[in-house]
Amino acid sequence: MTDLTTHDLAQPGWQTRDHLDDPVVGELCNRFGPDAFTVQATRTGIPVVWVKREQLLDVVAFLKKQPKPYVMLFDLHGMDERLRTHREGLPAADYSVFYHIISIERNRDIMLKVALAESDLHVPTVTKLFPNANWYERETWEMFGITFNGHPHLTRIMMPHTWEGHPLRKDYPARATEFDPFVLTKQKEDLEMESLTFKPEEWGMKRGTENEDFMFLNLGPNHPSSHGAFRIILQLDGEEIVDCVPDVGYHHRGAEKMGERQSWHSYIPYTDRIEYLGGCVNEMPYVLAVEKLAGIEVPDRVKTIRVMLSELFRINSHLLYISTYIQDVGAMTPVFFAFTDRQKIYDLVEAITGFRMHPAWFRIGGVAHDLPRGWERLLREFLDWMPSRLDTYVKAALQNTILKGRTQGVAAYNAKEALDWGVTGAGLRATGIGFDVRKWRPYSGYENFDFEVPVGDGISDCYSRVMLKVEELRQSLRILDQCLKNMPEGPFKADHPLTTPPPKERTLQHIDTLINHFLQVSWGPVMPANESFQMVEATKGINSYYLTSDGGTMSYRTRIRTPSYAHLQQIPSVIRGCLVSDLIVYLGSIDFVMSDVDR
């Protein structure tokens, strides 16, 4: 599973390290020479290596060909470096592009960075090495104006095609009040309507062959089977899908831009809405990444409470996924079962946090308040109720021969294809790779829990993905039972000046302790200048936050990597040659919501 040593796992997450002892750094230096790189010390927990633009493709190709290769492009994006003041020892750069690549066999990551001058914002595309770089490069061009030479279709992806400017540049306004008043003239309205006219050539499609014309069909953005504001343009020969193009961005809210104008604390409610079904699961990577920046170790009680809430929301999300998946195939009853079961979870979550879907309850250094009296009874009642209900879902619907006939062998892909497209979560594990962050890279005390990671037999299809989620539900119930029986005693927040007001008795003795409290409450906590990273096993795959602090009260750069974005990009490669009815089943089996895609 991993070649991480006990020493690696024992290192504090908040320790600033250059990771020169990581084998991959030595391999790169032996191949390209030590002068080819600048190694950056961060709190990301992985090697961060600046490479020269002209060597980028060679370095990436080298990493892919190693005995234990780096096979998944996990993330790719950019940063406007122009206003960053703490850049000691780094290459001169107005902008930078980073490439986060994972080796499954090593269970290790590396982040490559390329420095760019404002006068020459060009970098070669890596789409020939990693096909999933396509969407990431399009978004980076759109947000920063960085051109990827050789990209097959470098167009806007999140914003309308008529949009002007690059929103994540530091000189781009962050609030509507900073723009000129919006006026929709007749000319502008006509221009906007004209831009919506469908032209196959603009999407890389052919109108037809020498002997026949293709039919083009819009599925969405208001179709019940598209699971949100999501459009897929289908190129059809009869009912067979010749090609298709996913069209995303309708739900884009500028979540990463918002991170640059909210304090470290006040951004927490926004994290709930990245994947609006995941609740506290979405808060976890953000608060852990901020705690790395601050150097905060939280009490064991906090870790266990966070795990408990995360698993409750995981079950809640999985139940909705399984029931709507069955509904997409044609059965209604499980949906009503699921909402009954999910109501019990919401009652429990509301009793603990005070809210239901979006509690914004995790805090930097702890949680908002301690567990209420009676939480054990509510959790025990749910744990007694749920296992038999799961059996009902399986017997009533998932073992149905019609459902199996509609889903087995449909939209199937293997492990290599999953890694090429950046697939994580159940979609990857169904191919036989048991990569679950809770097991492979434990966080928040998951290493103390006894649970299994369900793994498929080598092929991920619509049926295997949903059955894996059923088994994951059983494992989450197992984790919750351990939380109930082994909840540690102790405080529900860390005693740290960046996050927690001092006790009153201390302020009565030392008035200077109020200085920190005054600053944190009025301006927000000031985080040390550094970079941190945290990935978690979210409800739909791996979710991560990559934070850059410039020593201020707000994040200099907040990068959010979501699993659904990668999963939707994979759709054309899987569904070509299938029928439209197969696409409906495939969409239901992915488990996505558009807020997770569009951010």
Curated annotation (Swiss-Prot):
Gene Ontology CC terms: NADH dehydrogenase complex; plasma membrane
Protein name per its UniProtKB record: NADH-quinone oxidoreductase subunit C/D
Keyword match Cell membrane: yes
Gene3D superfamilies recorded: Cytochrome-c3 Hydrogenase, chain B (1.10.645.10), NADH:ubiquinone oxidoreductase, 30kDa subunit (3.30.460.80)
Annotated HAMAP family: NDH1_NuoCD_1, NDH1_NuoD
Enzyme class: translocase
Organism superkingdom: Bacteria
Region named NADH dehydrogenase I subunit C: 1-189
Annotated segments matching region NADH dehydrogenase I subunit D: 213-599
Taxonomic path: Bacteria, Pseudomonadati, Pseudomonadota, Gammaproteobacteria, Enterobacterales
Documented EC number(s): 7.1.1.-
Organism the protein comes from: Pectobacterium carotovorum subsp. carotovorum (strain PC1)
Name of one Pfam family that matches: Complex1_30kDa
Stored SUPFAM superfamilies: HydB/Nqo4-like, Nqo5-like
Subcellular location: Cell inner membrane
Record keywords, A-Z: Cell inner membrane, Cell membrane, Membrane, Multifunctional enzyme, NAD, Quinone, Translocase, Transport, Ubiquinone
Family that this chain belongs to: In the N-terminal section; belongs to the complex I 30 kDa subunit family. In the C-terminal section; belongs to the complex I 49 kDa subunit family.
NCBIfam families to which the protein is assigned, alphabetical: NuoC_fam, NuoD, PRK06075.1, PRK11742.1
Subunit structure: NDH-1 is composed of 13 different subunits. Subunits NuoB, CD, E, F, and G constitute the peripheral sector of the complex.
